[in-house]
Amino acid sequence: MNFNKLFLIVILAALLLLGQTEAGRSKKLGKKIEKAGKRVFNAAQKGLPVAAGVQALGR
């Protein structure tokens, strides 16, 4: 009996999570994360040669 209740709850949760949703909020969040990733990548591209140069001076 408990298994049936648990199974029903799992199925309902899966339907809620995997059902069709509007892409508005998740798309905006994804774009913000992508933009932050691009900023980090660009900063790393600018900063790594400088760090390598400083390390070479220390030798």
UniProtKB/Swiss-Prot annotation:
Coiled coil regions, renumbered to chain: none
GO cellular component: extracellular space
Keywords (A to Z) from UniProt: Amidation, Antibiotic, Antimicrobial, Immunity, Innate immunity, Secreted, Signal
InterPro entries given in the database record: Cecropin (IPR000875), Cecropin_insect (IPR020400)
Residues spanning the signal sequence: 1-23
GO terms (BP aspect): antibacterial humoral response; defense response to Gram-negative bacterium; defense response to Gram-positive bacterium; innate immune response
Subcellular location: Secreted
Modification Leucine amide, positions: 57
Protein family membership: Belongs to the cecropin family.
Known function: Cecropins have lytic and antibacterial activity against several Gram-positive and Gram-negative bacteria.
Protein name, as recorded: Cecropin-B2
Organism in which the protein naturally occurs: Culex pipiens pipiens (Northern house mosquito)
Lineage of source species: Eukaryota, Metazoa, Ecdysozoa, Arthropoda, Hexapoda
